[in-house]
Structures are given as structure tokens and as C-alpha cells.
Amino acid sequence: MGTWARALLGSTLLSLLLAAAPGALGTNPGLITRITDKGLEYAAREGLLALQRKLLEVTLPDSDGDFRIKHFGRAQYKFYSLKIPRFELLRGTLRPLPGQGLSLDISDAYIHVRGSWKVRKAFLRLKNSFDLYVKGLTISVHLVLGSESSGRPTVTTSSCSSDIQNVELDIEGDLEELLNLLQSQIDARLREVLESKICRQIEEAVTAHLQPYLQTLPVTTQIDSFAGIDYSLMEAPRATAGMLDVMFKGEIFPLDHRSPVDFLAPAMNLPEAHSRMVYFSISDYVFNTASLAYHKSGYWNFSITDAMVPADLNIRRTTKSFRPFVPLLANLYPNMNLELQGTVNSEQLVNLSTENLLEEPEMDIEALVVLPSSAREPVFRLGVATNVSATLTLNTRKITGFLKPGRLQVELKESKVGGFNVELLEALLNYYILNNLYPKVNEKLAHRFPLPLLRHIQLYDLLLQTHENFLLVGANIQYRRV
């Protein structure tokens, strides 16, 4: 990333904002990122540091001309070897412009210009050096944030202005009248050049550095081998007094086949929180599209194998071993193997409340006898229900989860082999689910839900709250230079 990407928007925060692609009109976002006044203050501080380095690259052209010297007539002068050894930006603010974008306002900037001068008049040859000090420089830049039809972010400069309040010149030489004439020429020429060069440098940097950098942000991010997440913008960022809200689609989808979901994201009523630089409001829509994506991919389907049952229980997937559970099974299908196939009935809806993240999964477990012909014949089907709560944790870039299951409740839905001991089978399934299925799911949750951040951004002072229909993540931000 170029220094300008950090300079103008303090890309530490802009990286939170933009991953474009327009959404459907009238729908709610799945994720909202809110940049607070504290976040904008941090962006301004980071931006000033980087902008100082960028403006030190401003090149000043040589300048020549002629002027009249009393008693000597007209003479030629030239200013050359102009350098900027110091460029200090002392104060700056980054504020939202409602309905437009962002404004970067810099005041009390200071520039030191060092150069040489020479004067020629027939036989007269004079030359020496000078130092020019610009004080009270102000710079104002307005940026428009948006997205293009491809779904990627855009940033343009709508206006830029700079103004020099005071110039002091320290010029070396002996002829006072000549030096006074030179001073007026240097003051006028360099004031004009500096004011135009500063804005030109800024505008070129937006086009050449910041915009290409934003274009590298992917619209989608792969979570794992099964699913990805759509971080497209649903509209241009909303600038209001003291904050900037960015609306992301926030939809998780299966990688092998994406299709529209048949439910909408709920409206989120964000609290008026300002203790952190940035807040992520993640609606239950995000979690429910994740459940749907993994259901469509078949990730929730499972098989109970002999290796999953403790050896000391002496229970294997045979009709003989299942005699304690289903007495008639071994009589009707003597000495045959069993297959136990589990499926989640449908995508599971996650309910976010002020207390917790809750889910109520329902599963079917079907038993099939493997006949001597290798054909499979279904013999009974069980319904399994439970309550699941999730513990969520944060790190510098992602959210992780851990499921805490409740006890299973098993019912017999269908049987071709008569009745059986549901309580005993329920105990066996509780052991299996607790020791095999949930660890598998928790392993997947450990892969983490990535937040919409660009590279080199880290979060700290993390805050996690659950609200009705959404999860609120607050954080401060640090840009780690590389």
C-alpha cells in the first residue's frame, strides 16, 4: 500500500469501509460498520503522518525572469536547486460530509524551502542562497466514496484547495535593494507554485495510489472449503454528523452453487455507542445464511461408525449389538451390519437475543440394514432435537465460536422392527453427539468468521454484546506498518 492510502483516509479506517457491489433496493444489510468520531480522529492522525512524507516529494521548478534595478536598468534573475527539507502538518481533522463523503481539513501547516538565486546584468554576476518559511498553510480536500457497477469501491477528489497565510524569507547577500527585489519575486512565485503543487500532488495520489489500492479488496472472502462471504456494499457509505455507516450485504453462501436465499435481513437498531473507534453490527441474517450454506453443502450430514463408539461399550453396528435397543431387529435380520445416517432436517435458524446466541437443531437418524445382496433396507428412523448455545470470542481480525449443547431428546418417528428402548438409545446418541459431532462443528467454527478488514489492520480493546437480532462488536484500531 502506498503512503497516500494511509494519508488521505488513514486507510486504517477506510479499510473497514469499502468492498463494493450494489444490493437490492429496500433490503436491509446483514452487516453494518460504523466509524465513530474517535475513529475519524485516529484516521486524521495517521493520515497527517503519511501525508507529510508524501508532500516532501513535491518538486519545485526553477524560475527565471527579469526586473528593474535602480541605476542599473533591467537584470535577469533565476531561482534554482529548490528543495523542501521540512513539511510539517500540525493539526488536521477528518469529518464526514452528509450525503457526500469525507473532508480532510489541515491547518497550521509549515513548509521550509531552501534554494539558490543568481542575478546577471552585463558585467554584474551575483549568486547566493535563500530559505523560505511558509507558515499558516491550510489544506482542504473533499472525497467522494462510492462503488462501481462491478461491485468494487471508488474514491474521487471532488475538490482541493490550499492557502498560504504567511511567508518569511531569509536571503543571503549584501545589496539591500537587490535583495528586496528578489524577495518580492521569490515570495510571489513560490507562493503560487506551492499552492498549485500541493493540490496536484494530492489529486494524483488519489488516482494513482488510493483508488488502485481499494480495487484490490475482494468482494467475496472464502471462509473454508465449503463457504464464502459476500462483503459487497449495498449502497454508498452514509455520512452523518460525527460518524460514517457502511452497509454490507453480509451473506454467507456455498462455494459450489450460490442461489438466492428466501429470507431477508432484519432491521438493526444500533445503540448510540462511541467508546470505540469502530463498531460492527452483525445481524442474525449472517449466521442464518451460514447455516443454510452448510446445509446445502451437506456438511451437517454424518454417519455413526464403530470407531465413534467406545470399545468398552461393546456395541458395534450390527443387528446383534442392537438387540438391547431393538429386540426384534436381530430376529428379523440376523447377523447383518447396520448403517446409521444422520441428516439435519433443514437449515437451522439462529436466534440472537440480549442473553445469548441460540439454535434449536433438529436431526433425523436413519438405520439401514445391509442385506446379503449389499442392498440397504431402512428399518427405523429417529428424530433428535436439542438446544444449543454459542460462546463467541474475538481476536484481532476475526470472530470465533464454540457450541455448548444441551441434552438430546430422541423420539421414534418410524419403525419396521417394532418398539425399542428409546432411553437407552438416547444415552448412546448423547455420547456420540457430544464427543464426535459437536467437536467437528467446533473445529469448523474455529476457522473463524472474518471481519471486513484490509491488510495490516488489527483490532484491540475488543467489546462483544448481543442485542435483539444482531451481534455488536466494538474495537479500537491499529494500523501495523510493514
UniProtKB/Swiss-Prot annotation:
Please describe the organ and tissue distribution of this protein's expression. Answer: Detected in blood plasma (at protein level).
Q: Which residues form the signal peptide?
A: 1-26
Which domain of life does the protein's organism represent? Eukaryota
Kindly state a single biological-process term from the GO annotations of this entry: defense response to Gram-negative bacterium
Got a GO cellular component term for this one? extracellular space
- Keyword line: Antibiotic, Antimicrobial, Disulfide bond, Glycoprotein, Immunity, Innate immunity, Lipid transport, Secreted, Signal, Transport
Residues linked to a glycan: 301, 351, 387
Subcellular compartments: Secreted
Q: List the disulfide bonds.
A: 160-199
Coiled-coil ranges per the record?
Answer: none
Q: Which family does it belong to?
A: Belongs to the BPI/LBP/Plunc superfamily. BPI/LBP family.
User: What job does the chain carry out?
Assistant: Plays a role in the innate immune response. Binds to the lipid A moiety of bacterial lipopolysaccharides (LPS), a glycolipid present in the outer membrane of all Gram-negative bacteria. Acts as an affinity enhancer for CD14, facilitating its association with LPS. Promotes the release of cytokines in response to bacterial lipopolysaccharide.
- Tell me the protein's name: Lipopolysaccharide-binding protein
The upper taxonomy is: Eukaryota, Metazoa, Chordata, Craniata, Vertebrata
